[in-house]
Amino acid sequence: YVQMGKWCDKEARYPQRTPHQFVRQLIEAGVDFDIAGVQMYFTKQLLADCVLMIERYQGLGKCVHLTEVGSPSAGMTMEFADQEEIPWSAQPYEWRRHWDEELQADWLEAVFTVANSKPWIEAANWYDFVDPYGYLKSGGLLRSPQGEKKAAYDRFLRLKQQWQVQ
């Protein structure tokens, strides 16, 4: 929205700031806070670009929480729960190939591995837990409320065990 000068689908009424600019300006204004929350949904960018974006927060001297991490396991990233179905099979790939459960697990593992490698990132949270009730239609770690696990769920548990996180 910042690059487009918009508030969702409306024209912005005043100059926009990126989240990083906003946090930096809070610090410059002397606002007392401990943690910067960053959302990291799949952004159609290379993972390296996402890492660079996250690393910009390190220079601000605040702990970071990745408050919302997410990607779909089918369809398009922009296919939100409240929109009509998009003919995604006719669309270009967003990241490596069309989204599927294994690619969602790869994205989860990549982002959480980056977060685990940065001591100033104190927490990372996967946003959608169960389909179809999430922000992304297929963004959950479970396929349904009945508890059918996706590859990303198993990958998350494996990482947790590997890193000995409680």
Predicted segments, located by residue:
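Noncatalytic carbohydrate-binding groove/subsite architecture in carbohydrate-active enzymes
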Residues: 1-88
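Aromatic-rich peripheral "rim/lid" segments of glycoside hydrolase catalytic domains that contact
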Residues: 49-63, 72-166
